[in-house]
């Protein structure tokens, strides 16, 4: 084990190991063959804008979503309404280094990728002085429990199932993983490898469903041409029920 702050190396012989080390997990390589995360070709442009400089029509306690060809934007208040959080997802050029997650962003690149915008969205995006750029990666949906645990090693969160942000469930699934992991770890009547097997059996299928639904949502949000007209008509006719996911919010 290498201590990040001091660089000191220490050899440990733990009873069990949990890999919660994110998208570029090293622990994952002890459970599965070493492969790189999948490049989606999408970037998430992110910013926080003080609410006092937000256009008046957007100073509300609502979540607002714009969808368009190969893009979508989500805006919502945070910190008790003090700031407006903005996330804009569109195709873009990857940074040279991929091991970080937060990079400087050139607003001109973002606006070029977005194309023609609704005036309300354009106004608020242009009010942002500084944008950040997050490359989006994922992995294919889990195919079996063996992809989340092996022997005395278990994977949690993005180390096991990184997902696209189109369902906003990456952190949620990691929290559910942690709760299931704690439940299984408490099974002191079982050997460690059986506890982790039980954990993986509890979690893999739900995580796979969320991964797959996130990919599906992205395709819907970013539709182009006649398909987006059909999407818009369906949204007008069906309203919120079109995107409803009761199986998700009912819990595992």
Which residues does each PLM region occupy?
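Conserved mid-domain beta->alpha element of the FAD-binding
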Residues: 18-23, 75, 109-110, 130-222
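Alpha-helical structural elements of signaling/regulatory helical domains
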Residues: 81, 116-120, 187-191, 205, ...
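A generic structural signal for secondary-structure junctions
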Residues: 32-35, 50, 91, 186, ...
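Alpha-helix N-cap and coil->helix boundary residues
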Residues: 40, 191-194, 229
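Alpha-helical membrane-targeting segments
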Residues: 212, 216-252
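Conserved FAD-binding catalytic core of PHBH/FMO-like flavoproteins
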Residues: 1-129
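Short linear loop/turn motifs
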Residues: 127-132, 249-252
């Amino acid at each position: 084990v290498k201590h990040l702050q001091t660089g000191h190396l220490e050899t440990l012989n733990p009873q069990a190991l949990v890999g919660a080390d994110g998208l570029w997990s090293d622990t994952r390589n002890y459970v599965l063959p070493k492969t790189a995360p999948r490049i989606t070709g999408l970037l998430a442009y992110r910013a926080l804008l003080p609410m006092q400089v937000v256009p008046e029509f957007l100073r509300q306690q609502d979540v607002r979503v714009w969808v368009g060809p190969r893009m979508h934007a989500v805006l919502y208040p945070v910190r008790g309404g003090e700031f407006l959080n903005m996330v804009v997802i569109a195709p873009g050029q990857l940074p040279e280094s991929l091991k970080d997650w937060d990079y400087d962003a050139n607003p001109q690149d973002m606006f070029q990728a977005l194309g023609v915008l609704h005036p309300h969205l354009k106004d608020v995006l242009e009010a942002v002085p500084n944008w950040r750029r997050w490359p989006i990666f994922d992995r294919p949906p889990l195919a079996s429990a063996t992809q989340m645990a092996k022997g005395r090693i278990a994977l949690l969160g993005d180390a096991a199932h990184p997902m696209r942000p189109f369902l906003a469930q990456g952190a949620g699934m990691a929290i559910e993983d942690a709760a299931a992991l704690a439940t299984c770890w408490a099974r002191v009547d079982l050997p460690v490898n059986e506890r982790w097997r039980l954990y993986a059996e509890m979690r893999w299928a739900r995580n796979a469903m969320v991964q797959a639904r996130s990919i599906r949502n992205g395709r819907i949000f970013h539709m182009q041409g006649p398909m987006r007209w059909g999407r818009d008509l369906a949204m007008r006719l069906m309203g919120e029920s079109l995107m409803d996911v009761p199986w998700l919010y009912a819990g595992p």
